[in-house]
UniProtKB/Swiss-Prot annotation:
Highest taxon in the source lineage: Bacteria
One GO MF term attached to the UniProt entry: trans-2-decenoyl-acyl-carrier-protein isomerase activity
UniProt subunit comment: Homodimer.
Descriptive protein name: 3-hydroxydecanoyl-[acyl-carrier-protein] dehydratase
Annotated SUPFAM superfamilies: Thioesterase/thiol ester dehydrase-isomerase
This protein's UniProt keywords: Cytoplasm, Fatty acid biosynthesis, Fatty acid metabolism, Isomerase, Lipid biosynthesis, Lipid metabolism, Lyase
Source taxonomy: Bacteria, Pseudomonadati, Pseudomonadota, Gammaproteobacteria, Alteromonadales
Keyword rRNA-binding: no
Pathway stated in the Swiss-Prot or TrEMBL entry: Lipid metabolism; fatty acid biosynthesis
CDD domains given in the database record: FabA
Principal cellular location given in the protein's record: cytoplasm
GO biological process terms on file: unsaturated fatty acid biosynthetic process
Entry EC number(s): 4.2.1.59, 5.3.3.14
Amino acid sequence: MSKANSFNKEDLIACGHGELFGEHSPRLPIDNMLMIDRITKINADGGEFGKGEIVAELDINPELWFFKCHFDGDPVMPGCLGLDALWQLVGFFLGWEGAEGKGRALGVGEVKFTGQVLPDAKKVTYKLTVKRKVYRKLVMGIADAVMEVDGREIYSATDLKVGIFKDTSSF
């Protein structure tokens, strides 16, 4: 298992194909649904609660697919994509720690949107701090996070929950 503390886009794509942490590890989405270009920091004992943290980035440019369809004449990154990126990162964290299975978002306590990502922005930064890790029959991560655009916080989310399942057929 890789215990690197940063990952580039190629690494994240490899994770989406089951090639980074192993074929049974949780996978990131691929292609347009991968909302992360790099992870600049990941550790198992940092963050506000001392249980781990992740800092990741997405480069923004006017040609990104969602600006072409959300909305015509008023392009803005859908808030749900930023929220999904935060869940992606919780699942990635669990795979990085060695969990095996399929990742599924299980919920979020509270989400606040106080800004937007427009085509002229340069960079989105995601900052997560892990609150709880459960390694029993159900593997689950719970984290709080913020999303910034060009250094300004625009989203916050509490209690992001991701579970890792050996079998999702009855989920």
